Amino acid sequence: MKIPYARLEKGSLLVASPDINQGVFARSVILLCEHSLNGSFGLILNKTLGFEISDDIFTFEKVSNHNIRFCMGGPLQANQMMLLHSCSEIPEQTLEICPSVYLGGDLPFLQEIASSESGPEINLCFGYSGWQAGQLEKEFLSNDWFLAPGNKDYVFYSEPEDLWALVLKDLGGKYASLSTVPDNLLLN
């Protein structure tokens, strides 16, 4: 019998249980960026913004990197932008979340990697998801979230609309069967 992944730590993925069926966290996959006794924060990987980014927000002379994704990182501070990237030349102000996935960077760094045609993968996340001390543990113990190991393929190369089902399938067992649960159980 395969033992389920149970590491609530930086770099883990939080996969919403099908029981979370409303709101921003419904079928969400969150990359846990920090987890400590003081609380936790992460970025939703599979929710788009639902609107186009205006030129007023993203005003770079030249954007040649086609590996840029705009995501809704979570419901908190939606006007704050966080940068996930795969750049191996890490500026000082970045943090490795899991292998080849980094959080952080300043505006000159973003401009540089956005203007490079062969630039790294970039997820620009607006807002974040946060939990107070002990809150995420309680939600996990209540089976609101499943855990999976994070990796760059999930973060950068998976289609956002397929990510929730993909991670559950990859977990196997009972999780794989949950990946086929329809959004609306009345349609089942």
UniProtKB/Swiss-Prot annotation:
Disulfide bonds: none
GO cellular component: cytosol
InterPro entries: AlgH-like
A Pfam family the protein falls into: DUF179
Alphabetized Gene3D superfamilies for the sequence: VC0467-like (3.40.1740.10)
SUPFAM superfamilies: VC0467-like
Coiled-coil ranges from the UniProt annotation: none
Top-level taxonomic group: Bacteria
Family: Belongs to the UPF0301 (AlgH) family.
Name assigned to this protein: UPF0301 protein CPn_0139/CP_0633/CPj0139/CpB0140
Native source organism of the sequence: Chlamydia pneumoniae
